[in-house]
A protein has these predicted regions:
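Extended non-globular scaffold/tether segments
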Residues: 190-201
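A conserved hydrophobic secondary-structure block that centers on an alpha-helix together
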Residues: 214-217, 221
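Active-site-surrounding "flap" and adjacent substrate/cofactor-binding loops of secreted or lumenal enzymes
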Residues: 538
């Protein structure tokens, strides 16, 4: 009889094989290790473009093409697993975004024609520039190498508690309930309904596949597993999940759908939302810890959504529980790219924290990550929110936080390259009669103000029209007030704390520090020599080494450290 360890080993080997196959299919990629499986032979999607520029937008365009892509997905069932479902493809691949597009799609004749019509690495067709142009912003966006956030999708977090309470059938009932209250929002509700029905069809294909597989499975334990999987899928196709296995399977199906739609990878407080199901099933005698660990490992395998574990509540009570430990053990048992973040605080369970660090060092696989509650909570409270909300703002992204279901932060989609801002300031410094770091800093602030202004204009454009371009039809289902009002998450959020990354802080701090140290204090170099080095791309080795060997940011008490503080005040 196969043990859980045997099955996990097989699942991990399959994951590695799939990764190697995807590398051949996709070519070079600089992305997350998604939970995708390879594209099957004969897979094809015929996108529907509802814009003259050859792309699709809005409620009709996004819902229709989501249905086409998810309907093209074959069911994925592995008898070794307790949960089923995988995703293979995503809508962004059909909107001219070269960053995400895999080789298998780039090489198709129709897509080559699409790309030839104007999609580039910087300007894809994800934004409807025919209706909402921003040519007036592009010169400064290019000048300061700004990642604008215009056309940025997902990068917020929905509240999974809503889905766990309603189920997919509950979504449909809620859509019809509020459609009656907002008859003028029929396009919104039609689109939401189409998407939910497509997810249910996705589940139905898995049900059919499992039914076909059960008679042919020779191992009794795997045949029994498939029978349980079938009952689980039937239970969650319409109704809300009631057991630990059901809630994990429901999450797996939703995560596949949200990834297909906009690559959404924001999960939830994993040891919090799943805890009631775990405790209830344990008390009922229908779940043991080894099975719970296997199910969690299976969920992490299906897709590496970003989850937070541990943490602290608004009363400073540690949130670590038995499931927190099991999640770490589950991740260790599968040991793939698991996007788990441990929230560390003063009252953190020291044994749990030690175990988390142990797994990081043992597996050397980049998990778990750690975030500091004190800095994150106190920093967010400076925006005027209360302590409870700050503690609910959890780590559910690659480098960002969000209050699930309430916040629309655009995190990690907007960046100003402050090294490029410094470069422009250095160009202007040549015109100064007496160059100095003080004069350079004044010029830097002038250019930074311009960069911030044009960035804000781009953000406002996105917020004004995101619903008309890329409405978040899947995440809307679990966003507070979205279905209730018939409006997109971008317009109905309670909190708008737009995050703008200042990329290049270390480079700029080091540069200011090097100039002050080598030119002004030590007088080893002159400003003319610095300008000559910039013009020649530091061809003179002596000048390059003098500047590069200056005291660096984070070395402790350096000029660069002082500049870093000044740059961020």
């Amino acid at each position: 009889m196969l043990s859980y360890a045997d099955r996990l080993r097989s699942m991990r080997e399959t994951k590695i094989r799939h990764t190697l196959e995807k590398r051949k299919q996709n070519g070079y990629t600089d992305l997350d290790d998604f939970g995708t499986v390879p594209i099957s032979e004969g897979y094809h999607v015929e996108p529907w473009y509802n814009s003259e520029n050859g792309s699709f937008y809005g409620f009709d365009g996004m819902s229709e093409n989501f249905c086409r892509v998810i309907d093209a997905h074959e069911p994925y069932v592995d008898p070794m697993e307790m949960l089923c479902g995988r995703w293979r493809d995503m809508l962004v691949n059909y909107r001219g975004d070269l960053h995400y597009m895999p080789d298998w799609l780039k090489n198709s004749l129709k897509n080559k024609e699409f790309l030839a019509a104007g999609a580039t690495h910087q300007w894809s067709k994800r934004w409807d520039e025919q209706r909402f142009p921003y040519d007036d912003l592009k010169p400064l966006q290019e000048k300061y190498n700004i990642t604008t956030g215009i056309d940025g999708d997902a990068h917020f977090a929905c509240d999974y508690r809503i889905g766990f309470e309603l189920g997919f059938g509950g979504f449909l009932e809620k859509i019809e309930k509020y459609r009656k209250l907002h008859p003028d929002k029929s396009a919104f509700y039609d689109a939401e309904k189409r998407c939910v029905e497509a997810i249910i069809r996705f589940i139905d294909r898995h049900i059919q596949k499992i039914e076909e597989m059960i008679p042919n499975e020779t191992r009794p334990e795997l045949r029994e597993n498939l029978s349980e999987m079938l009952l689980t899928c039937k239970a969650v196709r319409y109704d809300p999940p009631k057991t630990f296995r059901q809630v994990c399977q429901w999450t797996a199906f939703f995560n596949c759908a949200s990834r297909i739609y906009t690559r959404d990878g924001a999960g939830f407080q994993l040891d919090g939302l799943l805890l009631p199901y775990y405790e209830r099933d344990k008390a009922a005698g229908i779940l043991d810890d080894e099975t719970a660990k296997f199910l969690i490992a299976n969920l992490l395998l299906i897709d590496p959504h970003y989850y937070q574990i541990s943490g602290v509540d608004e009363n400073d009570r540690d949130r670590t529980n038995a499931l927190s430990y099991l999640i770490l053990e589950a991740a260790d048992s599968i040991n793939i790219a698991c996007n788990l973040t441990v929230r560390v605080h003063e009252n953190c369970d020291k044994a749990f924290l030690g175990k988390a660090v142990y797994y990081l060092l043992k597996n050397k696989n980049g998990w778990p990550r750690f975030c500091n509650d004190k800095t994150l909570a106190e920093g967010y409270m400076r925006n005027g929110v209360d302590k409870k909300t700050a503690r609910e703002r959890i780590a559910v992204g690659c480098n960002w936080m969000c209050v699930p279901g309430r916040e629309f932060p655009m995190n990690d989609t907007v960046k100003i390259n402050i090294a490029k801002v410094l470069d422009e300031a250095l160009k202007d410094l040549r015109n100064e009669k007496e160059p100095s770091t003080a004069a350079l800093f004044t010029l830097y602030k002038k250019h930074l103000s311009k960069a911030v202004e044009v960035t804000a204009a781009g953000i406002n454009l996105h917020l004004d029209h995101a619903e008309e371009v890329t409405p978040e039809l899947i995440m809307n289902l679990m966003m507070l007030r979205s279905l209730e009002t018939g409006t997109d998450s971008s317009r109905c959020a309670e909190l708008y704390t737009i995050g703008v990354d200042g990329a290049g802080l270390a480079v700029v701090a080091d540069s200011f520090g090097a100039l002050e140290q080598r030119v002004e204090k030590e007088k080893i170099l002159t400003w003319d020599e610095v300008f000559a080095a910039l013009d020649s791309n530091f061809a003179d080795e002596r000048t390059r080494l003098i500047l590069s060997s200056s005291d660096k940011y984070c070395s402790g008490g350096s000029l660069a450290d002082e500049w870093a503080k000044k740059l961020t005040e």
